[in-house]
Regions:
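Mature-chain termini and adjacent capping regions
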Residues: 1-197
């Protein structure tokens, strides 16, 4: 159940929220939507699945569609979330936990950006998701960032901030007061102003 204010172009409710799109699935509790600003805030118990464009179900099932080599997605949870379609970003806030193919990540805030290009010449399914792009371009993690590799939990990275450039496949760790550090499987510690992980 939700309330809709057509005059002010807003909606909101306190019940469970479920949203499904080709690039993003969302479960949560309570929401506020501002259709003029193109934002949706989810108040609590947020769980999301973010797919790369190669894993878009609509593209797979259409005529001539092919299964991707690898189904690329991440799952994440947090206390609350803000979707800003105009800026093509999703922000998870509070007790964020991310599970992806090779590692777990925890942090205070995670911001996921979609690119502004339609890599396939006009991916309508991405446009209908409100992001108008072909996939995740950048991921920022802020506040008590911890990355733990799945294949060896003793390999960890600690930082105040992380920037992941998805197309380039790079992860950069930085610190405010304390340098970020990496702990190898052998227990060796590497620390520096900026670390590429």
């Amino acid at each position: 159940e939700c309330e809709i204010d057509q005059h002010n172009r807003r909606a909101g409710g306190n019940g469970e929220v479920f949203f499904r799109s080709p690039l993003l699935d969302l479960d949560g509790v309570g929401f506020e939507a501002d259709f003029t600003r193109r934002t949706i805030a989810v108040n609590s118990q947020v769980k999301i699945v973010i797919r790369q464009s190669s894993a878009d179900p609509a593209e797979i099932v259409k005529a001539g569609g092919k299964l991707p080599f690898k189904y690329e997605y991440i799952t994440a949870s947090g206390d609350s979330m803000l979707i800003d379609s105009a800026r093509r970003e999703v922000m998870l806030i509070g007790n964020v936990r991310v599970d992806e193919d090779r590692a777990f990540l925890t942090c205070d805030r995670l911001t996921v950006f979609w690119d502004g290009e339609n890599g396939d010449g006009g991916n309508k399914t991405a446009e209908t998701a409100g992001f108008g792009g072909s996939g995740v371009s950048r991921i920022l993690a802020d506040g008590e960032v911890v990355i733990t590799k799945k294949d060896n939990a003793s390999e960890q990275a600690f930082a105040d901030h992380m920037v992941c450039d998805v197309p380039k496949g790079t992860v950069k760790l930085t610190g405010d007061e304390v340098f970020p550090k990496l702990i190898s499987a052998k227990g060796e510690v590497l620390s520096g102003r900026d670390i590429l992980f």
